[in-house]
Amino acid sequence: MDIIVLLQQAVLNHASDIFVVAGLPVSYRANGRICREKEEKLMPPQTKECVEELYKLAGGRDIRVLEEKGDDDFSFAVPGLSRFRVSAYKQRGALSAVIRVITFELPEPNEIGIPDPVMSFYNLSKGLVLVTGPAGSGKSTTLACLVDKINHSMEKHIITLEDPIEYLHRHDKSIVSQREINVDTESYVNALRASLRQSPDVILLGEMRDYETIDVAMTAAETGHLVFSTLHTIGAANTVDRIIDVFPANQQRQIAVQLSMVLQAVISQQLVPTVDGKQVPVFEVMTITPAIRNMIRDNKVPQIDGIVYSSNKEEMHSMDFGLLNLYKDGRITAETALSYASNPEMLKKKL
């Protein structure tokens, strides 16, 4: 199997992911659907050879990490083709891999459906901005577009902490330091603590995985830095609850107060199928207001969704507002809108 040909085919077919798994032909995910190549099923020796070639393309990365731990994440670039993010793993004793295709050039935000209110958060000087949603919903791309906007318009020091690095940012008006976990630094929390001594203006934290990382991220936002990060939640209230619930019960009151002071926005996004067989992102945008700050501080978090739902303006709107607009524009069906809605009964009355 020629791994370069496999990667070229994925880029040519606008695939987002490539699956190399023993017992199946090579498979691609494009527009949310998985398509299998009409070839013979891959045997374990073939998947092993493919995974070994991926490690060679990643600059001779040590495959022993995968062999000893059973999984490994890394990224690499093929000049003139694209960047790729690999999650290699063992399944049924055979080496396998899922390869994410990452374009060299960032798409224009408006071309991929990122609304102006989301992009406006690049202009914040401090605080915490969270981009949330399920895996594969485009969170990394949204964050990369925000970093790119800052890089090309402001004189800042931007530090990104990623696992692994996806989009590469060239220095422009800003200085961009990109650090990869397990390559340039040991862990998110160590890198985050170190970044506070590196004169940052903006910190992009790839993922808030535990309470220790969340705690340091909020401290960074509290001390005058702009912090972007992600969570696998949908909806502003769910996101706030998730952050507070990560902490021990005796700290949750203090964390709620701290979060109410530093949180600037929660952007939730999903990819939904369109009538032409493609996908389009749909967003919920919550911008912080005095009323929402009070709700977070006073343990009235469930009421936040009501504020967002009733606002339904471009600068703050619910997921259902975005779905309704896509339906009115003829881009998605009513069934799709209802299946992705946060309040299907309410949305059904508006369709």
Q: Predicted segments — roles?
A:
Residues 1-351:
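Short, flexible helix-loop junctions that flank or precede catalytic/ligand sites
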